[in-house]
Amino acid sequence: RGSPLALAQAEEVKSRLLAAHPTLAEDAVAIVVIATTGDQIQSKPLKEFGGKGLFTKEIEEALLAGQIDMAVHSMKDVPTEVPPGLGIVCLLPREDPRDGFLSPVANSLEELPEGATVGSSSLRRVAQIRHVRPDLVVVNFRGNVNTRMRKLSEGVAQATFLACAGLHRLGMADRITAPMPVDVMLPAVAQAVIGVETRLDDKVTIDYLALIHDGETAQCVAAERALLA
């Protein structure tokens, strides 16, 4: 995927691979951008088009066709079942799993003016926003991190929520007004985890990835994804 965040995550996998395998030449790991249906649909909520698999289908097709050797995903976007022959074989250490509250007019969700507009396209976030502040108006907010922050600065909404991990990876942690306590806004399953998918018969790639796999993160992700299975 070609968004700044997707590229940053791919670069993190590449840098960890090169660090773990000093004999591996830098040009031995090339990043290939593949546009997904989910990236191209910006005007409507994803639930109208089939949900999370929209961010993985084209990438997995390229993996099965042998056009790429590994696929880098945000694990929160990966369906609980992956296509036969593929597997999530590597998970990087988890970043901050919390959602970040961003607003130019308030220091917290509770401090937003009555009837304020909040931008979000996430059913999970919208449900929890309305539980805490049923008076707020929620508008659809699609797009990558930069697009959503631009909409916020243009006044399309007075607040929005973005994953803290994504902002950290983009070097934009200073844009977070306040991290949301997990007992107020529960993060998505496997939020803040980068996963690497490959063909299960590609033992060479699996062996390379084994050195950057984080077992503790894998246990957490397995437990969380089991709730969705």
Residue ranges of each PLM-predicted region?
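Small-molecule-sensing regulatory modules
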Residues: 1-35, 40-41, 46-49, 56, ...
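Conserved beta-strand termini and adjacent loop/short-helix elements that scaffold enzyme active sites
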Residues: 32-34, 73, 91, 121, ...
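Short active-site-adjacent helix-start/loop capping segments
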Residues: 38-43, 71, 79-82
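Short, well-structured alpha-helical segments in soluble
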Residues: 53-67
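Short, Asp-centered acidic motifs that coordinate Mg2+ and/or phosphate
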Residues: 69-72, 158-159
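A conserved helix-loop-strand patch within extracytoplasmic ligand-binding domains
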Residues: 75-78, 82-135
